[in-house]
Amino acid sequence: MLETPKVLLKNLQDCKIHFIGIGGIGISGLAKYLKAQGATISGSDIAISPSVKYLKALGVEINIPHDPKAIKNQDAIIHSAIIKEDNTEIQRAKELKIPILSRKDALYSILKDKRVFSVCGAHGKSSITAMLSAIFPFFGAIIGAHSKEFDSNVRESANDSLVFEADESDSSFLFSNPYAAIVPNTEPEHLEHYDHNLERFFFAYEYFLDHAQKRVIYKEDPFLKNYSKDAIVLEKKDIRNIQYILKDGEPHTSFELKDLGAFLVWGLGEHNATNASLAILSALDELDLEEIRNNLLNFKGIKKRFDILQKNALILIDDYAHHPTEISATLKSARIYANLLNTQEKIVVIWQAHKYSRLMDNLEEFKKCFLEHCDRLIILPVYSASEVKRDIDLKAHFKHYNPTFIDRVRKKGDFLELLVNDNVVETIQKGFVIGFGAGDITYQLRGEM
């Protein structure tokens, strides 16, 4: 059983809450949601980010960098998972005896009275959550990425129902109070949080599913295929006649689901049809089928997930994929998109590995995932995400790709410049380029740094 957090957020209309690490996508989502609920929000982070800029524009006071003077008379402090005990603001809050909550403890207070459609899995959870938010336009939403439908990762609603992207990386999904638990896959990752114990890892997923009134699962997953309790089940054979089209110049997937007829959804790839199918099945007892079919058309994709930044002489796509399975699936989508555009350009990949631990844990899979649809591989330095640097010979491990190694990429108008030691070594003016990574590559590709 989970231990109920001792500190609960109450009376949000009068509550003053300070967020440490407010620029992160998960923490910023909670900050936006609680502000909309009536709380007074402040925060801090180590650097300016788009989320910080957005919150500042809403009138939120944010300190860059962390500053103990920012801790005054708040009712509670909420911090991201990467914030350590020796953080100066944490120490000041302890001195003032202000209650301190981790993000996952705060979730309990925020979600405990909500009817939550909670989506969790190694891959696809952001897309499924955003698809559900399109299907349920009157529900609130907290997503781990920006939905292009409403240009935010949060949508406030007076409705008690909420679609929520849950996080398995720190087991916070167990605090999400799922009315409906939607799980597309359970591929092991973030095992350091589970003491590298697979039994403990899968038990967490089982607990998550067991405590939901409604469960929607993809039975092709090795763990989920053996789940024995009642669940709405999706299998690969349930999805038929997958086709890819350009609709108003935008990539779409059409498919037939079970005996429910045909659906159309933004995006490309079999995984896209699978994600949409899980969202549809989650909504069947909530809405009329035709309303689901029509509302799904409002899904316009999410930022950093096959995010088409430009499509002129240089086709440029930004994608958050940072795991070999995700990269492989997205490269297939890139090939489909290139075919739809009738371009003969080779697919150039710019890859920024995210975290040394993930790179080392999945090294053999990373070495294979670019084989099928990558014509040229360009490799950026590893984005450490505050991890200690490890020695790894990327040139030796990836020599079969004959890769190009650079320090950074810079957007210059409609072109991309590749830099080594601050010198431009190449300019890409035309072609098909897709960037992969969960670090700052997204800002490099967008010319935001």
Curated annotation (Swiss-Prot):
Residues annotated as binding ATP: 121-127
Catalytic activity: UDP-N-acetyl-alpha-D-muramate + L-alanine + ATP = UDP-N-acetyl-alpha-D-muramoyl-L-alanine + ADP + phosphate + H(+)
EC number(s) per entry: 6.3.2.8
GO CC terms of this entry: cytoplasm
Pathway: Cell wall biogenesis; peptidoglycan biosynthesis
Primary location recorded for the protein, binned into one broad class: cytoplasm
Annotated keywords: ATP-binding, Cell cycle, Cell division, Cell shape, Cell wall biogenesis/degradation, Cytoplasm, Ligase, Nucleotide-binding, Peptidoglycan synthesis
Presence of keyword Magnesium: no
Gene3D superfamilies in the cross-refs: Mur ligase, C-terminal domain (3.90.190.20), Mur-like, catalytic domain (3.40.1190.10), NAD(P)-binding Rossmann-like Domain (3.40.50.720)
Compartments, record wording: Cytoplasm
Listed Pfam families: Mur_ligase, Mur_ligase_C, Mur_ligase_M
GO biological process, one term: cell wall organization
UniProt GO MF annotations: ATP binding; UDP-N-acetylmuramate-L-alanine ligase activity
HAMAP family, A to Z: MurC (MF_00046)
PANTHER family xrefs: UDP-N-ACETYLMURAMATE--L-ALANINE LIGASE (PTHR43445:SF3), UDP-N-ACETYLMURAMATE--L-ALANINE LIGASE-RELATED (PTHR43445)
Role according to the record: Cell wall formation.
Family named by the database record: Belongs to the MurCDEF family.
Name assigned to this protein: UDP-N-acetylmuramate--L-alanine ligase
UniProt organism field: Helicobacter pylori (strain Shi470)
Primary gene name: murC
